[in-house]
Regions:
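Residues on a specific face of well-ordered alpha-helices
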Residues: 86, 90-94, 102, 130-133, ...
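Juxtamembrane/interface motifs at transmembrane-helix termini
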Residues: 90, 96, 105, 149-151
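Charge-dense, low-complexity intrinsically disordered segments
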Residues: 18, 22-25, 82, 122-126, ...
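N-terminal beta1-alpha1-beta2 submodule of the flavodoxin-like/Rossmannoid cofactor-binding fold
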Residues: 1-57, 158, 162-178
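Residue-level signal for beta-strand positions within conserved beta-sheet cores that form or flank
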Residues: 1, 69, 104
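Mobile beta-alpha loop/short-helix "lid" or hinge segments that flank ligand
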Residues: 4-14, 99-117
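Helix-loop-strand module that forms the ligand-binding subsite of alpha/beta enzymes
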Residues: 23-100
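Glycine-rich phosphate/pyrophosphate-binding loop and the adjoining helix
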Residues: 109-178
Length: 178
């Protein structure tokens, strides 16, 4: 397993410049390519005012709208209190669903109170550790079960629904006995 970590704060200026110009810097392009070519994503954001951070959303905005189609995603977030935990299901999950990604069922939320729960043997015995393990198992299962994804079809191009390289005219010719 290869794990690539992308710290968005390192690309903040490049993200803004891309939004203004439409052209990514080499370092931002590398980050985008890392995300697009990944077998799966673990997307984690701090929660601000009951939603994901602006930088997180801005990075998502510079991705091609179809870049995450079918990609398994483990969603994570952190905030000061557990009151913000609903942001996973009411802000972050809908974002990835809109992009046709495949978020796993368990999201991981960490509040300040989730830290520092170790058992007698020094192993983390917190509910947070249990959520992380459950979400990781779901992500691993999604990666192993992932099949080839059907591309998103263009609703304004009837030929995109035919597949197999046949044209709409070819299909109509077959109906007419040609």
């Amino acid at each position: 397993v290869t794990l690539d970590v992308i710290e968005l704060r390192d690309h903040a200026h490049d993200v803004v410049n891309n939004l203004l110009t439409g052209f990514p810097s080499p370092s931002l392009e590398s980050a985008i390519n890392t995300v697009v070519s990944a077998d799966a994503l673990i997307a984690v954001t701090p929660i601000f005012s009951t939603s994901y951070s602006g930088l997180f959303k801005s990075f998502i905005d510079v991705l091609d709208p179809n870049a995450l189609t079918g990609k398994p995603v483990l969603i994570g977030a952190n905030a000061g209190t557990s009151r913000h935990s609903l942001a996973i299901d009411y802000a972050i999950r809908p974002l990835f669903t809109y992009l046709h990604a495949a978020p796993v069922s368990t999201g991981v939320f960490a509040a300040s109170g989730d830290w520092g729960h170790s058992g007698e043997d020094g192993v983390d015995a917190s509910p947070l550790a249990e959520r992380i393990e459950r979400a990781a198992r779901e992500l691993a299962t999604a990666i192993l079960a992932r099949e080839a994804v059907t591309p998103v079809l263009d609703p304004f191009d009837p030929e995109s629904y035919l597949g197999g390289g046949r044209s709409f005219g070819h299909l109509l010719g077959g109906l007419a006995g040609e």
